[in-house]
Each structure stands twice: as structure tokens, then as C-alpha cells.
Amino acid sequence: VVFTFFVPPIPGCEDVRQLTPNDEKKKFLEAYGIDYLIEYPFTEKVRHTAPKDFIREILCKKLCAAFVAAGPDFCFGYERKGNVALLEKMSSLCGYEFEVFDKVSYKGEPISSSRIRACISEGQMEDACEMLDRPFSLSGTVIHGKAIGHTIGFATMNLVWPEDKLLVPIGVYLSKVKIGGNTYQAITNVGHRPTVEKDAAKSDLLLEAHLLQYSQMAYGEEIEVSLFHYERPEVRFSGLDALKEQLKKDTLACVTYFEERGNDGKKEGFVEERA
């Protein structure tokens, strides 16, 4: 059982963009074998709950917790005054077992959500992937675009960037896209399409993924896009011919990247997973 607070997203508020929004969190926890997820409403009353009251009223009375585990830096209760020392002290009084998880390090420093967020915000996708134990990804329904990619041989699957999802630097990423049980290598642009948009700065932030070795229509389909490597910034090209030539270079970079790295260091083809 995993206990977490549910904080409703606030549209348009950059401060609440999440590394893993609620829907994604549920999917990942299920994949990791978690049986139950408790999303406790984070109301004003809960926010002002004293640490000891949180343990007695929520952990013990409402959840009937028999075993509690937390990281060494875990804080809770009003003004974050509760800590693992208090959880340990109250365990005998409230009848639960308590264990502190050890910190996990990467490149000699402890892994934390703030460190992962910083890596993603700076485009350091490989480091983020290592610390997350998975690539940074997002899911959504494919929407219609302007179909300009079709005219130059680089059709894309388009997603609007979710309002509650942590932003990545604008640019082109070497990626993988999962659709219909299969996973394909892809070049993915996250940005405002300055080559084809007259007023790009005011356009929606769009994710455009060109899948290698995939040519079917996917409008209305659910896809998952995983960003493995930040390749280059988004550029305004002189025209579609120049854009096409750059996309050819990006495609070669994508193929080379995954040939060298693959999954677990193994070379693999374009289609890697089947349902």
C-alpha cells in the first residue's frame, strides 16, 4: 500500500507542474506491483494538522497502519515539523512497526525529486533516466496538426503538452513512442514550430513525434512518448527543404544513439516490444 496526498492541479500555475502527475503515478505504481494507492485529500484542515495528530488520527485511526516506512528526510504535519524521529517514537504507542529507508545515491549524491526535476529542466535526460529508473515520459491522445510533416516525408503524432506536467527545454529529443503494444524509435520536437507558425511564441506548446518505420494514421490513439536524449534546440529554418534536411540528420542521430545504447546495452531493431 502506498499513501500519498492528492493535491488538485491548478490550471496555468507553473509552480504545481509535476514530475509525475496523478494519472501517471497510478500507472507506474501498478507496474511496480503496488496493490493499493491511497490518495488522501490535502485540504486546509489536513495542512494545519499537527504531526502527532496526523499520526494518531490519520495513520492509526483511519488507516489502521500496522507497518510504516519512510525516507530519512521525510517531514509531515503542520509546517513540516514531524519527522522520522517522531514516527519512530510514536510507533510503540500507536502499535505500528516503523522502518527508515536508506538513501540511494547516483554519481556520489543522494537521489531526490528536486535533483531529478533539475536534470529534466536542464535537458539532462540520461541522468534523469538513471535516477528515475525509467525514461521521462508523457502520455496523451494524438490530435490533428497541420499535416505539414506529411508533405516532406516526416509525418508526426502530435500531443498538447499537459498543463500539470513538468516542462522540458524546448528542442528536439531522441525518443521512443509506444502505440498499440509496440515501441518505436522516434525524433520528437517539443516546442512552438517557428518554421511553420507565423506567431510561434503565442502558439500552444506541442509535442510532435516522428516514428521511424511507422506510417499509419493514429489520430485519437493513446500513445506514450519517452524522451531519452536532448539532441538540439528548436530552430527557425529558411524553409521546408532546410527543415527536411535537418530531420534526416536527426533521424540518423536517433538510429545511431539507440544502436549504441539500446535497452540494457543491447542492440535492438526499430520495433522493440510487442503485447
Locations of the language-model features?
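Classical nucleotidyltransferase
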Residues: H48-A155, K178, S238-A242, E268
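Conserved beta-strand segments of alpha/beta enzyme cores
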Residues: D35-Y36, E97-E99, E224
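Structural signal for conserved beta-strand scaffold positions within catalytic alpha/beta enzyme cores
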Residues: V2, E39, V100-D102, L227
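Short secondary-structure boundary segments
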Residues: P41, P72, V190-H192
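Short, solvent-exposed coil/turn elements at secondary-structure transition points
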Residues: F6-P8, T43, V104-Y106, S215, ...
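Core alpha/beta nucleotide-donor-binding catalytic domains of modification enzymes
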Residues: V1-L63
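Phosphate/ribose-recognition catalytic cores of enzymes acting on nucleotide-derived substrates
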Residues: G145-A275
